[in-house]
């Protein structure tokens, strides 16, 4: 094997013999080659290894890229289908092994940073203000952050005030659903655990290390023989199960440690500052409740999702309570017990005589064990009731569809709310404390209960705005209003909606057969009311309106909520927090105007929930990164979101309203993704104030939450960034000259982007032909359609996720950078001296630095020679000239952008200041080349199948008897390459 070792020999400065990442890459490559040699025929294994080595060695030896890539193309095109599938699987396996390794090393580095008590001293000489903090690419730990804040003379009272108000919400989503199967994820976890054991080699004997390596090989060989592709399109409940896996396996046990680490860091630096609330960091979910464009998410599905979440929590609490019962063997012969606990035991004895008879003799002198036996019974009865509710659906009590005897038998015995469970645990805790004892396990369980409750995560409802206006249109047509609703102006709509909101009579007749769509819209609100009755308001409180354009969009939802009993007119309280989602650039620009109209409405203001010690009204507002980027490009999207935040915060402050911004960030840069720490630091000064809500996309869950320390690292990163942004204000956002410059860059970039993407009539054909977009839509990875409207083929109907996915697979990555070079060039052409200002912005302004950093990282992954091959091979003959023109525009913009990014950053090469990232991207770029050519080969064969006669000259199979491969077999091969490239690029859409 020469690949990684060759790079080691040729890049002494880049590779370290002592670095665990470098060291274990050799282990991974040896493992990969060993598995191939045992699982594939000899000639096939050697050919696959040769193919990977060719990518490394030819570039390392200085061969021209065109020459060695032609060699790869020749090898790929000579493969039959069986060999092609083996190659796709092999490269996919390789990249997934590398991903696991990098996650493991990242986890170890976090552990090291947490346990190294001297780490903060390296930052003593940092300029503590924004410029220096902006230069820190690496996230800081709580210990480092509090040490810095102390050096900055941040008053303890100011820090404590922020911590008490801190509210961090991470919302798991299912779009895109992670492309890797759940079964494969389990195998990856086992591989990660074995790697972890191997990495402590200094404590292992030679025999133990060899045994672990053999186990590792066995696991990977089993993985090789497991199907990577979903055999069926996952249902919404499958996606729910996938997302909740991370709560079950990692987050349930990890979350209590997060607050513990804050406590330790405060003790060292701010010993008198109180800890934040136990639930300062909590979770939400869209999985099973986001119905925007997904007809599979019905009211019944959302109900079953809530029941499933409660089932998982009850299972965890039963296990934890059972463990507590084993642990708390305190005897009354040797310890006092509080009178409150003894009184509760007497009450429980009356309610649960069977438990008393079964346990009293065994635990007659062990009150804690007896109390925990009663708690276990209550949890089991709660679980039994939950199963009945899940099985019979959300309508049962409304329509009397089932016999309630089974529910009656547990009435008054189960936990009606999580508060009752908490009360029982507090009794135990306080009794222990009163007698001089403590039990960390009780404290841990209480923290888990405070964070997760019985609900696990709150479910945000999301629906597109026109669904509500269409329902009201149908309603008003039935009521035969003088003026049709869709003919009203915005002012007339607002007046009519407010009048109806203030009217106590019902508006919606109960005996009308509405259209299916309208009936389902109404049913969602009915289901939410039932959810809140059963689970409490915590389970489902936010209603997100996608594609919000106007004030009436929010008032329509409030009117429907009122009609379904979710709005109390007497107390003027709403049980729903209505959250507008502004997605396009034009809507982002209009957002302050829309919200100002609403804030001026006394009725609307009165419905906002009052929070915190100040009891101020709270408005949650969501900003969409994906569609604004697809609409106007990377720079324009980010700048308009930045500006909107400042304007909305100023508006909220003037109206004495608290603002919680909900960032709809995707996994990829083209959808707002990237390092969370940098992104949060780059938020405008004064917009966070300890409150933030962020989506965690399905595709990145594994990279953030698959391992306990990795999850803690991500959570600590987000939390420290929120604290840092909130306390160390960067007032550079208010610099007029900088804002004017950014506005010009955004406008020029947007114009150039839209000229290609929206105004060039050939771009859509280009995208459909030279990327695997149509094949991506056939991947069984999500319950959600790739397009908003069934059968539509226009760009506007295509979702942002497959839009970014297609460009990523073909190595263009266009949404993440196109237009940047032209914008920068335009600025410099007007005044070459502006280069100095751009460099200052990069050094001192976190927002601009984040922008440039993301573009730089994305450019490093672009490979225009591979992209050119997609165009030449997959583009139709009749479109050759127009496609060549489009490629030339893209190529010119790439080269311009790259040169100017290097000029601004002062670098000679992309990523040269980030050694680990540069090495990771470099290795992936070299290894992924054959997979791209293989994908093109299979896509060409697949698409030729639809032509009569087929025109491809590629070999389908060397065996004459097996040449007639079906379209499904070719599709399978193509989909495997999509899997592999997604793993190699480390994201999908």
Swiss-Prot record:
**What keywords were assigned to this record?**
Carbon dioxide fixation, Lyase, Magnesium
GO term, biological process aspect, one: oxaloacetate metabolic process
Catalytic function, reaction form: oxaloacetate + phosphate = phosphoenolpyruvate + hydrogencarbonate
Q: Which cofactor does it need?
A: Mg(2+)
Active site as annotated: 175, 630
| Source species, domain of life | Bacteria
State any single GO MF term. phosphoenolpyruvate carboxylase activity
- Cysteine pairs bridged by disulfides in the record: none
Q: What's a Pfam family in this record?
A: PEPcase
Task: Extract the InterPro entries matched here.
Answer: PEP_COase (IPR021135), PEP_COase_bac/pln-type (IPR022805), PEP_COase_Lys_AS (IPR018129), PEPCASE_His_AS (IPR033129), Pyrv/PenolPyrv_kinase-like_dom (IPR015813)
- Under the cellular component aspect of Gene Ontology, which terms does the record hold? cytosol
Quote the EC number. Answer: 4.1.1.31
Instruction: Name the family the entry cites.
Output: Belongs to the PEPCase type 1 family.
NCBIfam families linked to this entry: PRK00009.1 (NF000584)
What the protein does? Answer: Forms oxaloacetate, a four-carbon dicarboxylic acid source for the tricarboxylic acid cycle.
UniProt name for this protein: Phosphoenolpyruvate carboxylase
Natural source organism: Prochlorococcus marinus (strain MIT 9215)
Source taxonomy lineage? Bacteria, Bacillati, Cyanobacteriota, Cyanophyceae, Synechococcales
Q: Which gene encodes it?
A: ppc
């Amino acid at each position: 094997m020469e690949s990684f070792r060759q790079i080691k020999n040729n890049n002494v400065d880049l590779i370290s013999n002592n670095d665990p990442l470098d060291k274990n890459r050799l282990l991974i490559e040896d493992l990969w080659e060993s598995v191939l040699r045992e699982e594939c025929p000899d000639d096939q294994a050697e050919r696959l290894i040769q193919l990977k080595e060719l990518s490394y060695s030819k570039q390392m030896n200085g061969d021209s890229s065109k020459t060695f890539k032609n060699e790869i193309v020749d090898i790929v095109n000579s493969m039959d289908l069986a060999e092609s599938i083996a190659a796709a699987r092999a490269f996919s396996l390789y990249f997934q092994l590398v991903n696991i390794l990098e996650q493991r090393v990242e986890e170890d580095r976090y552990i090291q940073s947490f346990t190294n008590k001297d780490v903060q001293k390296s930052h003593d000489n940092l300029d503590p203000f924004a410029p220096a903090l902006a230069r820190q690419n690496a996230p800081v730990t709580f210990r480092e952050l509090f040490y810095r804040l102390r050096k900055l003379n941040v008053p303890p009272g100011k820090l404590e005030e922020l911590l008490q108000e801190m509210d961090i919400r991470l919302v798991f989503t299912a779009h895109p659903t992670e492309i890797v199967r759940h079964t494969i994820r389990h195998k990856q976890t086992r591989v990660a655990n074995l790697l972890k054991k191997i990495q402590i080699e200094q404590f292992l004997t030679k025999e133990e290390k060899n045994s672990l390596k053999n186990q590792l090989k066995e696991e990977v060989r089993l993985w090789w023989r497991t199907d990577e592709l979903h055999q069926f399109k996952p249902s919404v409940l499958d996606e729910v199960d996938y997302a909740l896996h991370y709560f079950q396996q990692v987050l349930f046990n990890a979350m209590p440690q997060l607050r513990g680490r804050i406590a330790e860091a405060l003790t060292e630096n701010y010993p008198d500052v109180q800890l934040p609330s136990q639930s300062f960091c909590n979770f939400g979910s869209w999985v099973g409740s986001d119905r925007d464009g997904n007809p599979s998410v019905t009211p019944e599905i959302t109900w079953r999702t809530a029941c499933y979440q409660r089932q998982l929590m009850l299972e965890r609490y039963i296990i934890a309570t059972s463990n507590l019962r084993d642990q708390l063997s305190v005897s009354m012969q040797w310890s006092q017990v509080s009178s409150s606990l003894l009184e509760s035991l007497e009450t429980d004895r009356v309610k649960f005589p069977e438990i008393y008879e079964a346990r009293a003799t065994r635990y007659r002198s062990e009150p804690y064990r007896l109390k925990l036996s009663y708690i276990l019974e209550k949890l089991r009865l709660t679980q039994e009731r939950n199963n009945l509710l899940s099985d019979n659906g959300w309508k049962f009590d409304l329509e009397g569809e089932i016999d309630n005897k089974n529910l009656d038998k547990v009435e008054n015995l189960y936990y009606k709310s999580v508060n009752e469970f908490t009360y029982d645990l507090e009794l135990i805790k306080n009794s222990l404390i009163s007698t001089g004892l403590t039990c960390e396990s009780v404290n841990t369980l209480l923290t888990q209960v405070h964070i997760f409750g019985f609900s696990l995560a709150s479910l945000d409802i999301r629906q597109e705005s026109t669904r509500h206006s269409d329902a009201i249109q149908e309603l008003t047509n039935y009521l035969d209003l003088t003026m049709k609703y869709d003919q009203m102006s915005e002012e007339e709509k607002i007046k009519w909606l407010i009048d109806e909101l203030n009217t106590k009579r019902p508006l919606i007749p109960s005996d009308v057969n509405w259209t299916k769509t309208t009936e389902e819209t109404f049913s969602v609100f009915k289901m939410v009311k039932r959810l809140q009755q059963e689970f409490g308001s915590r389970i489902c409180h936010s209603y997100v309106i996608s594609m919000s354009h106007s004030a009436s969009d929010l008032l329509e939802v409030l009117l429907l909520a009122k009609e379904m009993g979710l709005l109390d007119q007497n107390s003027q309280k709403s049980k729903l927090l209505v959250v507008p989602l502004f997605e396009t650039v034009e809507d982002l620009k209009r957002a302050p105007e829309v919200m100002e109209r609403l804030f001026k409405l006394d009725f609307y203001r009165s419905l906002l929930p009052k929070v915190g010690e100040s009891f101020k009204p709270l408005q949650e507002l969501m900003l969409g990164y994906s569609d604004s980027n697809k609409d106007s490009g990377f720079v324009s999207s980010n700048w308009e979101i930045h500006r909107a935040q400042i304007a909305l915060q100023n508006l909220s402050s003037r109206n004495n309203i608290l603002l919680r911004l909900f960032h709809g960030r995707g996994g990829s840069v083209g959808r707002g993704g990237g390092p969370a720490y940098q992104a949060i630091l780059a938020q405008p000064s004064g917009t966070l104030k300890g409150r933030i809500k962020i989506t965690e996309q399905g595709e990145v869950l594994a990279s953030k939450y698959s391992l306990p320390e990795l999850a803690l690292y991500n959570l600590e990163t987000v939390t420290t960034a929120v604290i840092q942004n909130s306390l160390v204000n960067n007032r550079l956002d208010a610099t007029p000259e900088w804002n004017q410059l950014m506005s010009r860059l955004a406008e020029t970039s947007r114009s150039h982007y839209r000229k290609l993407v929206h105004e060039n009539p050939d771009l859509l054909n280009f995208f459909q032909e030279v990327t695997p977009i149509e094949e991506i839509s056939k991947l069984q990875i999500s319950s959600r359609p790739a397009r908003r409207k069934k059968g539509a083929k226009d760009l506007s109907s295509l979702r942002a996720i497959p839009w970014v996915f297609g460009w990523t697979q073909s190595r263009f990555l266009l949404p993440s950078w196109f237009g940047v070079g032209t914008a920068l060039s335009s600025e410099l052409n007007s005044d070459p001296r502006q280069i100095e200002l751009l460099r200052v912005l990069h050094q001192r302004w976190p927002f601009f630095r984040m922008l440039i950093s993301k573009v730089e990282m994305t450019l490093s992954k672009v490979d225009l020679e591979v992209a050119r091959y997609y165009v030449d091979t997959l583009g139709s003959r009749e479109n050759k000239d127009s496609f060549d023109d489009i490629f030339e525009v893209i190529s010119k913009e790439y080269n311009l952008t790259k040169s100017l990014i290097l000029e601004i950053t002062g670098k000679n090469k992309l990523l040269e200041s980030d050694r680990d990232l540069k090495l990771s991207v470099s290795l992936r770029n070299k290894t992924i080349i054959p997979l791209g050519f293989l994908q093109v080969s299979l896509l060409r064969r697949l698409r030729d199948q639809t032509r009569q006669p087929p025109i491809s000259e590629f070999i389908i199979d060397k065996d004459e008897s097996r040449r007639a491969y079906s379209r499904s077999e070719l599709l399978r091969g193509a989909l495997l390459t999509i899997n592999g490239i997604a793993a190699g690029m480390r994201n999908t859409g």
